[in-house]
């Protein structure tokens, strides 16, 4: 079975950077920020292998658009899958209070 390649949108990268900055500088916890960013990246990398484990988003509009979801702690990771080219595209990474 061929693994899927993962691409992360600029917006999702910015989401991740903003979340890390908030934890590091606003909450004054750089170690927690580093662990959170690392954990989210590890969760994203799991998608390459465990792609079928994750479902479409609960929101019917997002589901109709083919937006899938996975979680890392309080963060929801939104992504699409292109089976034709074996790619996963990370669209957004948002704190669950925002979604």
Regions found by a protein language model. Give the residues of each.
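Enriched for short, Lys/Arg-rich terminal
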Residues: 27, 70-99
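Secondary-structure transition/hinge residues
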Residues: 24-27, 48, 52-55, 98
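Arg/Lys-rich, positively charged N-terminal/basic patches that mediate binding to nucleic acids
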Residues: 1-39
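Short alpha-helical
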Residues: 14, 42, 85
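A short, surface-exposed loop/turn module that caps and links secondary-structure elements
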Residues: 44-70
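Exposed loop/turn and edge beta-strand positions of beta-sandwich/beta-sheet ligand-binding modules
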Residues: 2, 66, 73
């Amino acid at each position: 079975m061929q693994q899927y390649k993962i691409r992360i949108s600029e917006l999702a990268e910015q989401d991740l950077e903003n979340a890390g900055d908030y934890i590091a500088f606003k909450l004054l916890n750089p170690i927690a920020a580093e662990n959170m960013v690392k954990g989210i990246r590890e969760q994203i990398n799991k998608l390459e292998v465990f792609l079928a484990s994750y479902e479409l988003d609960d929101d019917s509009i997002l589901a109709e658009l083919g937006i899938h979801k996975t979680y890392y702690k309080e963060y929801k990771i939104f992504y699409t899958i292109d089976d034709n080219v074996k790619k996963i595209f990370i669209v957004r990474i948002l704190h669950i209070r925002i979604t």
